[in-house]
Amino acid sequence: GAMEEISAVCSLQFDDRGDDNDDGVEIWYYNLDKRQSEGSYGFAYTPGSDSDEGLVAINWSTYQNADGSFKNSIASGSFYGITFMQELSHASGLKHPHDKGLLDQPRFPGLTHRSNEFRDKGDFDQNAHPFTQLSYVDKGARNGMVPESIEAYGFLQTPGALDIAALQWMYGINPDAASGDDTYTLPLENREGTGWRAIWDTGGVDRITAAGA
């Protein structure tokens, strides 16, 4: 899940203590009616932003029908699967690239307060998926790398390369991740759960294979 993917690239670890007293991160699920929930995927409070810092709230009614069935796939790699990773990343201290930080940290290079958060990709066109899962330039990023519409595949399964750099700057690296000889196999088709992965690998003799493609 999202916790494991974040912990795999940096020294931040998530432990279930069995209670909610002074937790660093809390995850809530809530439901809104159709009118209220339109466009609301979830939200989170970054450290230092609010007395509820570390809270992750997911609007379950965006993803699930009244009978419990899912409206769209929430599999890792799907468009809706991004929400869980993105909100947990906010609770861990990451911001949107188009926003300034609480301590006036700058926006992504090439973006200003006049930038369109859903369209402008900044320097080198990297304020977009799959370089960062915190960008609002997601579906239809016009870079040929992600689907043009909501799909069950084609989006990030892990923090993007820029997200990994930020997490490691804040928390330090995970020095033990993928330390052996690893093989990374490229998927052969676009189907539910197929998505982008940014590799953080700390050792061994590794290879990327497209065998069977």
Language model features: what each stretch is:
Residues 1-213:
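RTX-like calcium-binding, glycine/aspartate-rich low-complexity repeat tracts
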